[in-house]
Amino acid sequence: MFVFTVENIKDIAKVVYSQDGMDTKRLKKVEYSKNEGLFKDFNYDKYKITNPPKNTSMTVYNELQYLQDLPEDLEYVKEHDDIKKVFENVCIEHNLKYPKELVDSLLKSSAGIIIDLKFKFNRPRPFQLASHYNIDFGNEKLESMHTPSYPSGHSIQGILIGKVLQT
């Protein structure tokens, strides 16, 4: 059982994904999205307003406990970590032509916006917070886990591609 104390609340409140900020590769993606991509004229400032729950909130604590209780299915997670492959498989399953160039363009154009938002909020990954709450998570780290956790890039890009493909 975890007990909130003044000391651990102060420690938990300070946890961020990174103290280092964005590297050059990520900065180039942000610049591409702002200046060249499909969304170059898209003003996403309104998405910079809504903060995620505080690290010390019961919402975060309950979410971490929920994640801890989920069965680990590494094969499923790895299979669905590749957004392009997921949509390609859905198209194959439904005998539809997979629009590879369009999907590639959507992913490339949205990546910088997502990265910019992620580093604006600098939200720690769940495993970074879990240790402060004495919660044990698996040690498997995916390639997609090398940015702050909020907002979810997989969710944004999955919804974006799904909405475009349904039209």
Language model region names:
Residues 4-167:
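Hydrophobic alpha-helical bundle signature of multipass membrane enzymes
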